[in-house]
């Protein structure tokens, strides 16, 4: 315990010492250039700085002003499900540039490397409070969470998985809507996901839909608005 407090104190001292520098010196060092990556988080609303682990423990809500930080799909899953219970499904599906949209393939490749995701949603099976559930979490870092063929397919398969095994379904939406680079193919996903949810509903199963920032366009007009319970 003593070592833990010592390590925490050292981290806080690094931040305090840098923040105490004269303005000219701060500017020269670009404010946070000497802070180890991932240690420090600055709130865009109140501009206060905090240890990243404190922000994480506060569920990504600013301890100073209550601002809600954006949450990655991976972080949200870790926050929500029982420890070590999540198992990803349909993770091998990858988007193809079927319409030959300019620079789309390059964008996908770049985002895969920077986010560690293969598209804008992560789906899987997990336990929440000991109960088995199927969960889908969108990530706005990947092309603003837009819904293309792979996103629509992954969500549809997750719904079908839940229906077949008679499991409740949780989906966290964070999307700018249908993906323009896939044209009519992306719009088809609205009908496909809605149809799968109709069957899940007909089986008398629970679907809880969570609207997170941002949730707009074709996602709002399809699966996001079809929950038995909807939270925002």
Residue ranges with predicted function:
Residues 1-208, 214:
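Terminal-region recognition feature
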Residues 152, 225-226:
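Short, solvent-exposed amphipathic alpha-helical segments in soluble enzyme
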Residues 212-222:
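Gly/Ser-rich catalytic serine loop of serine hydrolases
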Residues 227-232:
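Gly/Pro- and small hydrophobic-enriched strand-loop and loop-to-helix capping segments
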